[in-house]
């Protein structure tokens, strides 16, 4: 929508006061912001979106003044609506600006840019892959800061993007993050690593497993409602666990290990004997796991995930679509 630059008038016909002028600007900002949001949602062409962003779309900054959308804020919209062409353009044209922290109205704290975590939350595999490729050209400190960003403690529990991937069962996102150097050993606000968080969720899933009758009813409901069954979620969590094992040199320690040892038979049934023995610190990883751990570490982030095609991957990794086109 064109921005109305004409001065307003008061009720008695005189010039409007500063309060009325501020309200008028805020109203126009809301209208133009919503128009830009809808334009991205409707997947309009990149050239048109950039024209709107440059000349027509404004939002209110923290002082209540009209401000143009930055590439960072535009990328947030592209992520929400999976506009891959627009996201790729912003990352290619404004790599640092697109991944910079947005203005205060688009975030809840002073943490680095939320784009990686948002891509995981919305399962935007294609855009996440482009983001990770973009940050490979950044200095090491800047790249690590973006990959290992800790979310807001109030809203995101102080977790990293790996925690988000485990929480929401996003194996494709997790594999991309690990392959590009995200740290699996960082703890969230509750003190859990991604691996420990995942074990906690698997434990909760197993504790709330339905009876056979409930499972049959859930199968019928899932077929009619197109929902994800609890069994499918559990399988995705086990796949997440297999992926984390490839990038985790040791098992779990502290309370998590005590939990594994406290109900060994249950965990052995859930994880399998070999995986349980290693995670609980009772035995070294199997030769297969150790070989895969060495193999994946030979792939540089710059060649990930393309170099996976050259490796004899195990069957559990082959169905993963890391292109975002599926």
From Swiss-Prot:
Pathway: Protein modification; protein ubiquitination. It is found in: Cytoplasmic vesicle; Cytoplasm, Cytosol. A motif (Important role in both nutrient sensing and binding/regulation of IMPDH2) lies at residues 108-109. Its main location: cytoplasm. Residues 1-20 are annotated as: Disordered. One of its GO terms (molecular function) is ubiquitin-like ligase-substrate adaptor activity. GO terms for cellular component: Cul5-RING ubiquitin ligase complex; cytoplasmic vesicle; cytosol. ANK repeats lie at residues 70-99, 111-140, 157-186. GO terms for biological process: intracellular copper ion homeostasis; proteasome-mediated ubiquitin-dependent protein catabolic process; protein ubiquitination. Keywords: ANK repeat, Cytoplasm, Cytoplasmic vesicle, Hydrolase, Repeat, Ubl conjugation pathway. Part of an E3 ubiquitin-protein ligase complex with Elongin BC (ELOB and ELOC), CUL5 and ANKRD9. Interacts with IMPDH2; leading to ubiquitination of IMPDH2 and its subsequent proteasomal degradation. Substrate receptor subunit of a cullin-RING superfamily E3 ligase complex (CUL5-based E3 ubiquitin ligase complex) which mediates the ubiquitination and subsequent proteasomal degradation of target proteins. Depending of the metabolic state of the cell, promotes the proteasomal degradation of IMPDH2, the rate-limiting enzyme in GTP biosynthesis or protects IMPDH2 by stabilizing IMPDH2 filaments assembly. Implicated in different cellular processes, like copper homeostasis and cell proliferation. This is Ankyrin repeat domain-containing protein 9. It comes from Mus musculus. The lineage of its organism: Eukaryota, Metazoa, Chordata, Craniata, Vertebrata. The gene is Ankrd9.
